[in-house]
């Protein structure tokens, strides 16, 4: 039993490293350019974005947050974020999405330290689920809950690999189609030049004959 448990721990640790999870801490200066963090997500995937912003309302700074993907879908736009802000959504497309922050100065008072410290956590797929709640609701043992989690992470990895394989095939087909078009364009251009050369020869011969030069 102990070797199986140890093996399970190794597998879980590996999948935890390769799973789609990211954490980031940074300072955002008031009036500076917006700061964005980008992640890719598959369609119909659960995403939880947790942002923790220090400071307090009325301190002369307003931190706004918005989440949108590359195809134009918007998933949230919390305003004047202070403390913890959590946004939960399900993606509408296979696309990258941006989590962007802006720090807008408010009021006329002079700020001694015009920065807000931000902590950002983005959980995607199986990592976005509350496994403690699932374990309690379904009355699962800790090992069973961990196996469920590992199974879902593995399924997500397989789905992502299939998506990448399909995209690679699509790009390969596009490349082959482009090569064929270039080939036929080259052949058509060559025959056009040959025809133009033949026409010039015939035209010059007719011209010289009309002038009795040949």
UniProtKB/Swiss-Prot annotation:
InterPro entries in alphabetical order: Emp24-like, GOLD_dom
Disulfide bonds: none
Primary localisation category: endoplasmic reticulum
Keyword rRNA processing: no
UniProt KW keywords: Endoplasmic reticulum, ER-Golgi transport, Golgi apparatus, Membrane, Protein transport, Signal, Transmembrane, Transmembrane helix, Transport
Residues annotated as transmembrane: 184-204
Residue intervals annotated with topology Cytoplasmic: 205-214
Signal peptide residues on this chain, from the entry's feature table: 1-23
SMART domains: EMP24_GP25L
Family indicated by similarity: Belongs to the EMP24/GP25L family.
Protein name, UniProt field: Endoplasmic reticulum vesicle protein 25
Gene label: ERV25
């Amino acid at each position: 039993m102990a070797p199986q448990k140890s093996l399970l721990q190794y597998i879980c640790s590996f999948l935890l490293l390769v799973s789609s999870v990211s954490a980031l801490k940074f300072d955002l200066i008031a009036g500076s350019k917006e700061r964005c963090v980008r992640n890719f997500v598959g369609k119909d995937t659960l995403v939880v974005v947790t942002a923790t912003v220090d400071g307090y309302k009325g301190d002369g700074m307003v931190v706004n947050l918005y989440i949108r993907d590359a195809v134009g879908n918007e998933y949230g736009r919390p305003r004047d974020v202070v403390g913890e802000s959590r946004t939960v959504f399900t993606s509408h497309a296979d696309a990258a999405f941006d989590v962007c922050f802006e720090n807008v100065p408010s009021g006329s008072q002079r700020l001694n330290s015009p920065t807000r410290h931000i902590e950002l956590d983005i959980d995607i797929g199986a990592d976005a689920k509350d496994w403690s709640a699932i374990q309690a609701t379904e009355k699962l043992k800790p090992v069973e809950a961990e196996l469920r989690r590992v199974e879902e992470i593995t399924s997500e990895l397989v789905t992502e690999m299939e998506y990448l394989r399909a995209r690679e095939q699509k790009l390969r087909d596009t490349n082959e189609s482009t090569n064929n078009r270039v080939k036929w364009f080259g052949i058509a251009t060559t025959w056009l030049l040959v025809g133009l050369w033949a026409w010039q020869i015939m035209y010059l011969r007719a011209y010289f004959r009309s002038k009795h030069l040949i």
